[in-house]
Regions:
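Structural recognition of the beta-strand scaffold that forms the well-ordered cores
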Residues: 43-49, 77-79, 100-104, 138-141
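Flexible loop/hinge segments that line or gate small-molecule binding clefts
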Residues: 1-8
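Basic- and aromatic-lined ligand-binding clefts that recognize polyanionic substrates
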Residues: 14-72
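Solvent-exposed, acidic/flexible segments
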Residues: 11, 15, 19, 58-62, ...
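Proline-aspartate-enriched helix->loop->beta-strand connector
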Residues: 90-103
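Structured C-terminal subdomain patch of bacterial secreted/periplasmic proteins
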Residues: 103-168
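Short helix-initiation/N-cap motifs at beta->coil->alpha
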Residues: 81-90
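Extracellular/periplasmic catalytic domains that process cell-envelope and extracellular macromolecules
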Residues: 38-41, 94-96, 130-134
């Protein structure tokens, strides 16, 4: 799309700058992650979307962060256990032994969305026993970079994601 727009405006330099250069940055980040010493179990994640009135598991497709995680080579348990998409099963989450849990908020009230997540954790104390939670790998991500398309900040989004995924 950017290629077409820059054809119309006659500004191919912007396609190079805002399209190809950003793609090259992202490809470099993805290659670094692929080459990192990451075990298969460390690629296992769960993506949650939190709003003021709910917290739901999300699959890899149809969400910005889900597609980015898939693009990086992560394994989202909600993709293979689709019952999680309908009913957030604490037992299924514990059984999967996740390495990371990513949460992205939605809606205008981010604090209310975070409270929904806190309530989920309080109502299900078994979630606190997850290694991902105990070891600080429950990541609440910036919705402007990971729920909405980050536009000119795609490379920054991938860099932040890379940093979270490679934290030990």
């Amino acid at each position: 799309m950017l290629d077409i727009c820059t054809d119309i405006t006659g500004r191919k330099d912007l396609y190079e700058q805002n399209g190809l250069a950003v793609k090259a940055q992202i490809d470099k980040i993805k290659a670094q992650y692929a080459e990192a010493d990451i075990q298969d179990g460390e690629r296992k994640i769960l993506l949650l979307r939190a709003a003021s009135s709910f917290v739901k598991a999300k699959g890899s497709s149809g969400t910005v962060l889900g597609e980015m995680l898939c693009d990086m080579g992560c394994i989202n348990i909600a993709d293979s256990n689709t019952s999680l998409l309908e009913n957030l099963s604490v037992e299924a989450i514990i059984w999967e032994e996740l390495y990371h849990i990513f949460v992205v908020t939605m809606g205008s009230d981010t604090e209310a969305a975070k409270r929904s997540l806190e309530n989920l954790m309080k109502e299900n104390p078994a979630l606190s026993t997850l290694d991902a939670v105990k070891n600080g790998r429950l990541h609440v991500m910036d919705k402007t970079l990971f729920n909405l398309k980050p536009n000119d900040r795609w490379a920054e989004s991938y860099e932040i994601l890379y940093e979270k995924l490679t934290e030990k």
